[in-house]
Every structure is written in C-alpha cells, then in structure tokens.
Swiss-Prot record:
Entry's localization field: Cytoplasm
Keyword Transmembrane: no
Family membership: Belongs to the TACO1 family.
Coiled-coil features, chain-numbered ranges: none
Descriptive protein name: Probable transcriptional regulatory protein mma_0544
Organism: Janthinobacterium sp. (strain Marseille) (Minibacterium massiliensis)
UniProt main location, coarse: cytoplasm
Length: 241
C-alpha cells in the first residue's frame, strides 16, 4: 500500500533527537522511573518498562543510569514522584497538538505549556478537543531498500495491522500498542532493523505546512519540546521546506 513521503521527516526527526541527546536521557529516566512504579521493576513482565529500557539502549544511556531509575521507580531508591498529564491544543491554522508531560508540579507545567502555545500562535484546548484525531498504536519505520514483501509477510504474521510504503520507499508498520514488543521481536528475528520503533499517538490525517506557516509551526513545536516537563509531542502537522 503506497503513501506520501515520510522518510525525510523521519530522518529530520532522528537528527533532532541526536542533537538533544542529553534531554532525551532525562526524559527516558523519568519514563523508566514511572514505568517501574506503575508495573514493577521486572523488564520481562512490564512491557512499558521494556520499551523504555530499549529506548535507553538505543540512546546509548549508561546501564547504571537505567538501573538506578528502575530502583527509584520500584522503591529501591528515593526519588521524585512524577505525575503523568496530557494537554491538548491547536497550532498554526488549527493543527492538532498533543503534549504528554511528566511533572512533580502540575501548576507549573500547565502554565508553561499554555504560555508556549500562546506565545507562538497556538492555544490550549480542553480535554478531548483533539485527542480523538489520534490513534494509540505501535509504529515502526524501515529505510528505503528494505524488502517490502518479506517485511509485510513477517509483520502481518506477527500481528501488525498495516504496512505502507511511501514515495521514497520508506516502509511504515502499524500494530496494536499491546502487540508492540511481540511485533518488534518477530521483525528483529526475521532480520529487520527499524530506524524508529515507538508506541505513539498517530494522527488519522496529516496537514502539510510549508513556507512561513511551516516556520511558525516549527517554532511552536520547538518551544513545547524545550519545556523540561514535556515527554512527547504528537501533531498532525507535517513540516516541509
């Protein structure tokens, strides 16, 4: 199944992640801590924790940091008690934005998120205002040149819902969030290495931004991204140019 080009956006996103590795480590420590607190410190029995630990390995985080975060979450070490909050809002031209946060101070966080939206041309929405435009799912991206037929066979057999190829040959695999680890293991066993593998909120439709609107939308996303309490940002805006 063909789709529009996403490969350049994936490469751009990976580049931005590399630039912000220190911030990514901080976010992963929070995620590991909360995952261990919610589901226990056994990686094999806690899919959310396993995903966070896998991300930490991909980000080259030292194992000692991972171990300490698990211990803090499971009660072995003292640590901050983080609360998970999701904010919804609108960007340029009404683009939908979800902002997932982990915070020890809800009042501070909501003020910072609201300020970022207002300063850069967006506005905060109410709960449920844009969340319905996204689907919770596992998402994998594979580089152009990957054997599409073999990947599709392995993915669908493992429980994937959909496999699409964009105009540059990049391949996206979508699966239910609870099947993410099983699909990842099956694809790895079949010899496929994903460029990105995450559980995400995927927009049902996307809006392409170019020119001045693209610049404005990127500034808003950057402002949100730079907030210490923000863990993940999801949007239906595709920035081009």
């Amino acid at each position: 199944m063909a789709g529009h080009s996403k490969w350049a956006n994936i490469q751009h996103r990976k580049g931005r992640q590399d630039e912000r590795r220190g911030k990514i480590w901080t976010r992963l420590i929070k995620e590991i801590t909360v995952a261990a607190r919610m589901g226990g410190g056994d990686v094999a029995a806690n899919p959310r924790l396993r995903l966070a630990v896998d991300k930490a390995a991909d980000a080259n985080m030292p194992k000692d940091n991972v171990t300490r975060a698990i211990q803090r979450g499971s009660g072995g070490l003292e640590g901050v008690n983080y609360e998970e909050i999701r904010y919804e809002g609108y960007g340029i031209n009404g683009a939908a934005v979800l902002v997932d946060c982990m915070t020890d101070n809800r009042v501070r966080t909501v003020a910072e998120v609201r300020h970022a939206f207002a300063k850069f041309g967006g506005n905060m929405g109410t709960e449920g205002s844009v969340a319905f435009m996204f689907k919770h799912c596992g998402q994998f991206f594979f580089a152009p040149g990957t054997d599409e037929d073999k990947l599709m066979e392995a993915a669908l057999e493992a429980g994937a819902d959909d496999v699409t190829t964009d105009e540059e040959g990049g391949i996206e695999v979508i699966c239910p969030p609870h099947d993410f680890s099983a699909v990842k293991d099956a694809l790895t066993a079949a010899g496929f290495k994903a460029e990105l593998a995450e559980v995400v909120m995927k927009p049902a439709t996307e809006t392409v931004f170019q020119g001045d609107d693209a610049i404005k939308m990127q500034k808003l996303l950057d402002a949100l991204e730079n907030l210490d309490d923000v863990q993940e940002i999801y949007t239906n805006a595709v920035i081009e140019g």
